[in-house]
Amino acid sequence: MQVTFLGTSSGVPTLNRNVSAMVLKPPQRSELWLFDCGEGTQHQFIRSNLKLSQIKKIFITHMHGDHIYGLPGLLASIGLAGSSSGIELYGPAPLKNFIDSCLYNSSSRLAYSLKFHRVENAANNKEILFEDSELEVKTAPLKHRIPSFAYRVNQKTRPGRFDIEKAKSKGIPPGPVYADLQRGEEVRLEDGRIFSGKEFCGPPRPGVSMVYCTDTVYTESAIEISRKADLLIHESTYSYKETEMAYERGHSTATMAAQIAAKANVDQLILTHLSPRYTPGNQTCPNDLLNEAKAIFPNTQLAKDFLQIDINKS
């Protein structure tokens, strides 16, 4: 599982940071999941090694402009390319009206299906938002000036590694039967012999997990959805010096993000959604936010546009 940051600034873009967007590449799939879509996100795709045509799911955290203004144009561009087989869009209830209105008033027609999923019920009732045989997505309400939601992607436990040489030594011919054995199933060969997949597989391999948490001030629900995640991506709009402003505006300081990471017992924290006031040369710069967080949670990294992170078990 890999994440790529396409926008790491809050509110407005800067010379080096675009507004919020992050891409998840699920393991062993030729598809991309986009989290938030601030203005200019499709330009960031062009500058990266990612393809718009591979987007299959889009998750929007909340309805502030720096998280959604890039979405209508991105959807229209995908339609013009004519290469999408359909997109699933997840977000707060007003998102559907926003997209429908933008497309209608610009006379834009999508050449693919766009299916919208409201997230409020899943968030408030702690239900699974999406699930297939390999992945599941959960969501939780955050604490912001308007309704805002965190997302967690869990990779399910996978079968242990298949010992091909052992299977060959037993005279099991290569082919589809290997896939059955790898799934732990029992198989019968043409000669009547029966084998259990458990004989040829190592211990089950736990999947990895990623949590995307923005915009929010410190809240227990952020801790709950982040518990024991391999990677927590959390907003860090302000320094601890602006704690009062953070509470007033519904944002987190680097200290708050680190406290959430520590209490949730995550493996790694990445800070994103930095206020444009923190630029190199100013009284407070991004590295100050990083050091602030690392004093509480040492395994912290600062996001920057086009940073790619592979999520692995520690």
From Swiss-Prot:
Positions in coiled-coil regions: none
Transmembrane spans: none
SUPFAM superfamilies reported for this sequence: Metallo-hydrolase/oxidoreductase
Gene3D superfamilies: Ribonuclease Z/Hydroxyacylglutathione hydrolase-like (3.60.15.10)
InterPro entries reported for this sequence: Metallo-B-lactamas, RibonucZ/Hydroxyglut_hydro, RNase_Z/BN
EC id: 3.1.26.11
GO molecular function: 3'-tRNA processing endoribonuclease activity; zinc ion binding
Alphabetical keyword list: Endonuclease, Hydrolase, Metal-binding, Nuclease, tRNA processing, Zinc
Binding site for Zn(2+) 1: 62, 64, 144, 215
Entry keyword Disulfide bond: no
Catalytic activity: Endonucleolytic cleavage of RNA, removing extra 3' nucleotides from tRNA precursor, generating 3' termini of tRNAs. A 3'-hydroxy group is left at the tRNA terminus and a 5'-phosphoryl group is left at the trailer molecule
Oligomeric form and interacting partners: Homodimer.
Its biological purpose: Zinc phosphodiesterase, which displays some tRNA 3'-processing endonuclease activity. Probably involved in tRNA maturation, by removing a 3'-trailer from precursor tRNA.
Similarity comment text for this entry: Belongs to the RNase Z family.
Protein name: Ribonuclease Z
